């Protein structure tokens, strides 16, 4: 996608905030535990390579991604740390993963038997076995299949049994009932293994923040890197998470609309008195949700309502008085003591903060501050 460097809209990513969030979490961990930075989905929209570098600087000892392509991109950028692909990879790429020293997630024995002929003992494939303890997504549910896979990995020099893990569905909720059920299922399955792999891990950001007693020796730290609360506003984190992303723009146009004039597609907003309306060059093609009509942005410390439907490339706001083109607009971030968070946007849109940042498209340039890394 073409990046819009010749318009005012920018995503400003704070390297210092990312480093601080990672360091704060590492300080809470057992000395024997490692933190792998989850940088999938273009670093939750913040930029894969820059975020990987910042987290590496802060003490992350490895990375988690969703797909093999993300892992290969990290390798091509020169990262030598361990990389775990959390999703299931097509078995035909097993040899490539082994060659690039990328660890893969496996959830059934058949995958291993199909992969084995492609592999060599000189370049063994590192494997983490996924356990489905209640997420209903991927992994072994019963001990028989788990132990069959573990035995194959242990006895075949073409594999390295590197890890076993699960993922919790409700670690960010107040009611611990289902979480505790998953913990119990995980321990019962792992306890059947005659020999444990190097990594036994369960903790995403939410688990590590609110259920640290469950931490294994590897933490998959994700949304916390970016300063977002995985529970939204349901639970308070044990330390202040520093938001790493600001979405800013400028007024591209400002005009006085007379009483009775309407704004945007569908004419869903009609001014009831003469009003100053500003246009901001950002829209749903940039990942700013179309449903945010009625939400607000910040101009000069004022909350300004988004009026009319959000367009593909532009949106309109009601101004308290005249402002010239070029006036700063904060869509997410701070202005004169007031703020709009990604969670605020998500709550209005009926979704979660992760989806908001992941949804910002490449058309919005990412600008990095507090670091000398240039995209």
Curated annotation (Swiss-Prot):
InterPro entries: Ala_racemase, Ala_racemase/Decarboxylase_C, Ala_racemase_C, Ala_racemase_N, Ala_racemase_pyridoxalP-BS, PLP-binding_barrel. Keywords: Isomerase, Pyridoxal phosphate. It holds the Pfam family Ala_racemase_C. The modification N6-(pyridoxal phosphate)lysine is found at residue 40. GO terms for cellular component: cytosol. It catalyses: L-alanine = D-alanine. Substrate binds at residues 137, 312. One of its GO terms (biological process) is D-alanine biosynthetic process. It is an enzyme of class 5 (isomerase). Pathway: Amino-acid biosynthesis; D-alanine biosynthesis; D-alanine from L-alanine: step 1/1. Belongs to the alanine racemase family. This is Alanine racemase. It comes from Limosilactobacillus reuteri. The lineage of its organism: Bacteria, Bacillati, Bacillota, Bacilli, Lactobacillales. The gene is alr.
């Amino acid at each position: 996608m073409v990046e819009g460097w010749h318009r005012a809209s920018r995503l400003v990513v704070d390297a210092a905030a990312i480093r601080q969030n990672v360091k704060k979490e590492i300080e809470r961990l057992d000395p024997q535990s490692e933190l792998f930075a989850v940088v999938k989905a273009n670093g939750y929209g913040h930029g894969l390579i820059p975020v990987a570098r910042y987290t590496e600087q802060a003490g992350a000892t490895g990375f988690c991604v969703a797909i093999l392509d993300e892992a290969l991109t990290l390798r091509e950028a020169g990262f030598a740390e361990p990389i775990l692909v959390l999703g299931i990879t097509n078995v035909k790429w097993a040899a490539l993963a082994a060659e690039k020293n990328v660890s893969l997630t496996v959830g059934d024995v058949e995958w291993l038997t199909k992969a084995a002929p492609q592999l060599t003992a000189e370049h063994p494939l590192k494997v983490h076995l996924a356990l489905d303890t209640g997420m209903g997504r991927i992994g072994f549910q019963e001990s028989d299949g788990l132990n069959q896979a573990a035995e194959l990995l242990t006895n075949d020099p073409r594999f390295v049994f590197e890890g076993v893990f699960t993922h919790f569905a409700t670690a960010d909720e107040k009611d611990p009932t289902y979480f505790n059920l998953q913990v119990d299922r995980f321990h019962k399955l792992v306890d059947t293994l005659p020999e444990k792999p190097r990594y036994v891990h369960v903790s995403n950001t939410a688990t590590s923040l609110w259920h640290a007693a469950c931490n294994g020796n590897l933490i998959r730290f994700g949304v916390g890197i970016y300063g977002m609360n995985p529970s939204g506003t349901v639970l308070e984190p044990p330390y202040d998470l520093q938001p790493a992303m600001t979405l800013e723009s400028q007024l591209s146009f400002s005009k006085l609309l007379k009483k009775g004039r309407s704004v945007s597609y569908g004419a869903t907003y009609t001014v009831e008195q003469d009003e100053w309306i500003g246009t901001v060059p950002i829209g749903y093609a940039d990942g700013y949700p179309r449903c945010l009509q009625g939400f607000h942005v910040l101009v000069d410390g004022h909350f300004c309502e988004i009026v009319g439907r959000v367009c593909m490339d532009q949106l309109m706001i009601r101004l308290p008085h005249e402002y010239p083109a070029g006036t700063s607009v904060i869509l997410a971030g701070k202005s004169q003591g007031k703020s709009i968070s990604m969670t605020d946007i998500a709550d209005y849109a009926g979704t979660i903060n992760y989806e908001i940042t992941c949804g910002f498209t490449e058309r919005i340039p990412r600008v990095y501050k507090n670091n000398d890394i240039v995209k």
